């Protein structure tokens, strides 16, 4: 007979075996984190931010519509329209107010035109093969938005019981919404769906997206995708937004690192830190929007010329050939040298500028090299170790036989570099002039201050 201890051990073993048998076979298999599907048309897309107020002398949708063929020829794919809604009057800033102080989520700002004008703009964009996303302000409204009178309980209140602008910022022209209220969530989602159905909008850039609960955005994305595949850009810098809500997010850390390098406050290590975090901590499907200018920076921090100085061309090129979703802010192609006024009419002065040719060539180059496409279609960056690692950024992006080798001298001194490992070896064509070049571990490359070399396998 078995002793009691032996019987107990046998029983425990039997239970363990039974438990293992009941365990699903994929218990330890990796599970996908990102559940949303990017629209197929975003795979190699370039974003273009259009500030209707300043884009043309007229400042209207109709005038902007006439410029769409030019934007198509430039090569951009997605037009991001800054908010199109009527602007609040109460506590308004400046003469015309901030477009981010929304008075009516279902209305069109008469400053820009009518709903028919907006629909005409979108229809023309679609005929040209472009897509249009709207800037959406879900975090707050103008003081005189009708929701304030109809649903005062949908708003945040401070310790005194008064309506509360977003804390700590000088946003006195707006008051915050309270997303603990299901009625508000339904209203806001329905308003977004209205623009997709009524005006043919293809998605949204969501202002201060991280100030609104993520579960709201995830549900809104599901309801929007049920109408048609949409593209969603979050003004936020957090990986979780990519799980089920947003295709793309702001690469604030990239922009700050590049600006610090240009100002002599950091070296290439700042970019190492950014790219390391993206590859180690962010989902591979996350599109990180890289840019050298947007409306906030231009208005409040300085033009791209002020922020990047002699490093600007290299910064622009890196935003296109490194990992990321490139953005062009209207006027960059004309080398706009001014800080555009935010609350007044201040039209861009359009002129011929080398930036236009640079953007056009970069876009064509990027589209012809799938290794440079947006996540998850493009390739990850593989660092290439060089002899000046604090001054020169060098990397390879390679996928399915397509290979791009890029070098950036991010310093004010000439550099001559060699390479100590082999991912860069190969025969290339230079982006700058089409010349052929062979790279081996014995090769040295000379780089002028703040210059770049972008080399690609011929296609």
Model-derived regions: residue spans:
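Bacterial N-terminal signal peptides
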Residues: 6-16
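Conserved, mostly hydrophobic/aromatic
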Residues: 50, 71, 81, 105, ...
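C-terminal beta-strand-rich structural cap/linker in extracellular carbohydrate-active enzymes
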Residues: 439-459
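Active-site-proximal helices and loops of the catalytic beta/alpha 8
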Residues: 22-31, 35, 190, 197, ...
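Aromatic/acidic polysaccharide-binding cleft in carbohydrate-active enzymes
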Residues: 289-354
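Substrate-binding/active-site clefts of carbohydrate-active enzymes
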Residues: 24-46, 53-62, 66-77, 82-199, ...
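Structural recognition of the beta-strand scaffold that forms the well-ordered cores
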Residues: 46-49, 78-83, 133-134, 203-205, ...
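Asparagine-centered strand-capping/turn motif at beta-strand->loop junctions
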Residues: 407-411
């Amino acid at each position: 007979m078995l002793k009691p201890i032996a019987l107990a051990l046998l029983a425990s073993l039997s239970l363990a075996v039974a438990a293992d048998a009941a365990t699903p076979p994929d218990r330890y298999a990796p599970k996908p984190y990102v559940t949303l599907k990017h629209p197929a048309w975003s795979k190699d897309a370039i974003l273009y931010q259009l500030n209707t107020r300043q884009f043309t002398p007229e400042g209207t949708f109709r005038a902007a519509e006439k410029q769409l063929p030019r934007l198509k020829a430039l090569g951009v794919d997605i037009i991001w329209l800054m908010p199109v809604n009527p602007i609040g009057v109460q506590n308004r800033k400046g003469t015309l107010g901030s477009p981010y102080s929304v008075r009516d989520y279902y209305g069109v700002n008469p400053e820009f035109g009518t709903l028919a004008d907006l629909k005409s703009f979108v229809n023309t964009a679609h005929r040209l093969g472009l897509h249009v996303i709207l800037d959406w302000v879900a975090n707050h409204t103008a003081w005189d938005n009708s929701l304030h009178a109809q649903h005062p309980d949908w708003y945040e209140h401070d310790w005194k019981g008064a309506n509360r602008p977003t804390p700590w910022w000088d946003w006195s022209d707006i008051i915050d919404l309270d997303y603990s209220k299901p009625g508000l969530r339904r209203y806001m989602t329905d308003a977004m769906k209205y623009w997709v159905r009524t005006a043919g909008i293809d998605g949204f850039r969501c202002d201060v997206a991280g100030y609104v609960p993520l579960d709201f955005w995830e549900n809104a994305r599901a309801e929007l995708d049920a109408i048609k595949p949409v593209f969603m850009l979050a003004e936020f810098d957090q990986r979780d937004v990519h799980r089920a809500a947003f295709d793309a997010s702001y690469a604030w850390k990239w922009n700050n690192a590049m600006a610090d390098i240009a100002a002599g406050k950091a070296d290439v290590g700042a970019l190492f830190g950014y790219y390391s975090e993206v590859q180690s901590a962010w989902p591979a499907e996350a599109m990180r929007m890289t840019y050298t200018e947007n409306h906030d920076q231009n208005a409040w921090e300085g033009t791209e010329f002020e922020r990047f100085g002699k490093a600007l061309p290299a910064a622009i090129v890196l935003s296109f050939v490194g990992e990321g979703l490139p953005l062009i802010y209207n006027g960059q192609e004309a080398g706009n040298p001014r800080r555009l006024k935010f609350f007044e009419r201040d039209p861009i002065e359009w002129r011929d500028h080398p930036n236009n040719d640079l953007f056009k060539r970069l876009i064509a180059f990027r589209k012809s090299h799938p290794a440079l496409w947006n996540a998850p279609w493009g390739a990850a960056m593989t660092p290439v170790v060089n002899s000046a690692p604090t001054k020169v950024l060098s990397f390879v992006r390679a996928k399915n036989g397509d290979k791009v080798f890029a070098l950036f001298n991010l310093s004010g001194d000439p550099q001559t570099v060699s390479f100590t490992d082999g991912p860069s070896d190969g025969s290339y064509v230079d982006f700058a002039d089409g010349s052929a070049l062979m790279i081996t571990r014995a090769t040295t490359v000379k780089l002028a201050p703040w210059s770049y070399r972008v080399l690609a396998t011929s296609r």
